[in-house]
Amino acid sequence: MDVIYNAIDVSKHQGKINWEAVKNAGVTHAMLRAGYGRYKNQVDPQFERNSAECERLGIQYGVYWYSYASTPAEARQEARCCLAAIQGKHLCLPVAYDIEYEPCILRLRPADGL
């Protein structure tokens, strides 16, 4: 059985989202950028609001962490920052690790396990 969700992917780049309008448009799921990088102050500025609005309106959500890691140690630090950012959240969808920054990808080796 195929399951299709009407979902969106959001971050600070979408600005202050009108989540009621999003829900009224039929969106049932969202992936929220929780943050990026390996410092705790790199939580997405809209993450708290976006997650609170999803919870308030019953929109199921998961999160992603945008990675700049180029070593396993950096990736572990990013994972710790992500876990700190999502503590206490009520995620219904997975935590995803977003690796698309080309300079970091080019430094990765298969042996790194990333």
Say what each PLM segment does.
Residues 2-114:
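Substrate-binding cleft of extracellular glycoside hydrolase catalytic domains
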